[in-house]
Design a protein with these regions (language model features):
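Pyridoxal 5′-phosphate
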Residues: 1-410
């Protein structure tokens, strides 16, 4: 495998022109889009317009004149088309944590006689914290049951009310079989909430086709919505009017500007809204999503797998002396869009990589994690990144005090 071969891959890449849509610092190979996507070039202009023209000149009339009030539904629809959702089944709102709390709280109320919430030890800890917090509020015998990721489909029993599952493991990149787990859960009357934080924008998701009923996700990773961008939630049309919102805010009221003293939930997905939307952040996301208008997600998936295979092969060719252990060891259909390696000095190596312009991230206790984001990554990027990884490990340039000092964010 040589640079000529790599160059040919890039020349034949059907997605290569999309790289131009992003602000990518010179000399940086950005392999952390699974944590924070880069800035789409179209976003600053939209933010300037919203701030200077809409807020600055139109003031409060912008809620009508510039359709601020419909942003949660409009942005939700754009996301919905990317995750295989039915029309009017997704809204953009709040954070993933808040949306998980909303759907989880509403779901356990649908099956009050069941007291178990199921999740797995590979789930993102934040989701487990939300579950634990809700259980403290519920009391009355509720429990969180944790199992190994590979055991989920085998432990679905009729005392379980809800299962909370992140489709792609944030550390290893393992991808659960949404269709299989959802079908088996339904056989036992279990509601499943799918966390799509590492799925949306990474590969084609088919919520409707898989039979999924409930989902949440963020927009600042593969969707490139920006730091702290608003999240989204999905409820299948069949369940929408059964959901009783635990956070009954005015944006979820059937007529918010009637100012009724009593809460009456809106019909459909809108009842899951709560407070006033963050217009500036949601407008940025709205524009960021336009990057995907002419993108075939199946091509994204195909390139992602090729990037993975190239990365894995190049690391393997370095030999065992690197002490890097591949953690994403699953078949293609069971992988997300990242590649992870374990190394005893993973944190220091990652800091040295970042210092050399190869930006990935570290996840405790020893995981070097690299996001594979086909819209702006080239095959040459992967080739060069592995060259730098090899140099850092072979020269032990990672073994400097500055690379061992832990930052607040890893």
């Amino acid at each position: 495998m040589n640079k000529t071969y790599i160059s040919t891959l890039d020349q034949n890449d059907p997605l290569k022109t999309h790289r131009e849509k992003f602000e990518l610092p010179k000399g940086v190979i950005y392999l952390d889009g699974n944590s924070l996507g880069p800035l789409p070039k179209s976003v600053p202009g939209r933010i300037t317009e919203v701030v200077n023209e809409q807020w600055g000149q139109s003031l409060i009339s912008s809620w009508n004149d510039h359709d601020w009030i419909t942003l949660p539904a409009r942005v939700g629809s754009k996301i919905g088309r990317m995750i295989g959702a039915e029309e009017n089944s997704v809204v953009c709102a709040d954070s993933t944590s808040v949306n998980l709390y909303k759907l989880l709280s509403a779901s356990v109320r649908l099956i009050p006689e069941r007291k178990v919430i199921l999740s797995d030890t590979g789930n993102f800890p934040n989701d487990l914290y939300v579950i634990q917090g809700l259980i403290q509020q519920l009391g009355d015998g509720y429990e969180l049951r944790l199992v190994k990721p590979e055991e989920i489909s085998e432990v679905l029993t009729e005392d379980i009310a809800v299962a909370v599952i992140t489709e792609v493991d944030y550390r290893t990149g393992r991808r659960h079989d949404m269709t299989d787990i959802t079908a088996k859960a339904k056989e036992h009357g279990i509601k499943v909430i799918w966390d799509l934080c590492h799925s949306a924008g990474a590969f084609p998701v088919d919520l409707s086709g898989s039979g999924a009923e409930l989902a949440v996700g963020c927009s600042y990773k593969y969707l490139n919505g920006g730091p702290g961008a608003p999240a989204f939630l999905y409820v299948t049309p069949e369940l929408q009017n059964d959901i009783q919102p635990p956070l009954s805010g005015w944006m979820g009221h059937t007529a918010p500007f009637d100012f009724d003293l009593d809460y009456r939930p809106a019909e459909g997905i809108s009842r899951n809204l709560c407070g006033t939307p963050g217009v500036i952040a949601m407008s940025a996301l709205d524009t960021a999503l336009d990057v995907w208008q002419d993108v075939d997600l199946h091509q994204v998936r195909q390139k992602s797998q090729k990037l993975f295979n190239l990365f894995a092969e190049l690391i393997e060719n370095l030999g065992p002396e690197t002490d890097l252990t591949l953690q994403t060891t699953f078949p293609e259909e069971q992988r997300g869009s990242q590649i992870s390696f374990a190394h005893p000095q993973g944190y220091a190596i990652m800091q040295a990589l970042i210092d050399r312009g190869v930006v990935g991230d570290f996840r405790a206790p020893d995981i070097l994690r690299f996001g594979l984001t086909p819209l702006y990554l080239s095959y040459a990027d992967i080739y060069r990144a592995v060259e730098i990884i090899a140099d850092i490990i072979q020269t032990k340039s990672w073994d400097q005090l500055k690379y061992h000092e832990r930052g607040l964010v890893t």
